[in-house]
Amino acid sequence: MPDTESQTQDKWAQYPCTILEFAPPERLRIDLRRPLGAPERAILASLGLDRPFAVLTAENPMGENTEDEPTPVQQAESDQRNDARRGELEAELRKSGIEYQPCDGVAADGEYREHGVAVVLPREQAVMLARRFGQLAIFWFDGRSFSLVGAVARNPSEKLPKR
């Protein structure tokens, strides 16, 4: 079994291939492998996300989705833990009066999804929140483009799309 640092780096290498899916009312898919275009920017603006924001999740802390082919029982247990974590994150945001937009991170092949949120917070506050939920990284939008920013993982930030 690979060591924790190796697992972290394997996960980190996958993040730049993520598709961000924003929930209705404005269905939006942002492929982080491609530059952001005017249509995507317009929809982000309609969602109130035309300024810096973070995309983060509470699911699968430390990249814990290590089961390549979980049994139905393992999958049900994982789903239950993730539902509880997501509820805790959303409750914390609501209690703090912080608005959020549902936003899922999806593997490019569509085989993997983590439910998350897009939230307008200062970058360091978003990183601290992600760390509290055991997350390796967040996606950060600086008002122009996205970056991958380490939370628990201490990797240097990477502009997306990768060149």
Each predicted region: which residue ranges?
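Low-complexity, flexible helical/coil segments
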Residues: G97, L136-F139, A151-S157
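N-terminal, charge-rich interaction modules
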Residues: M1-A91
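Flexible, charged surface loops at secondary-structure boundaries
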Residues: L47-D50, E111, R132
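Short, low-order "capping/linker" segments at domain edges
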Residues: V120, G150-R163
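Short, compact, well-ordered microdomains
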Residues: R113-H115, V119-S147
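Structural alpha-beta junctions
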Residues: A84-Y100, G134-L136
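Mid-chain, well-packed structural core segment of small domains
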Residues: R94-P122
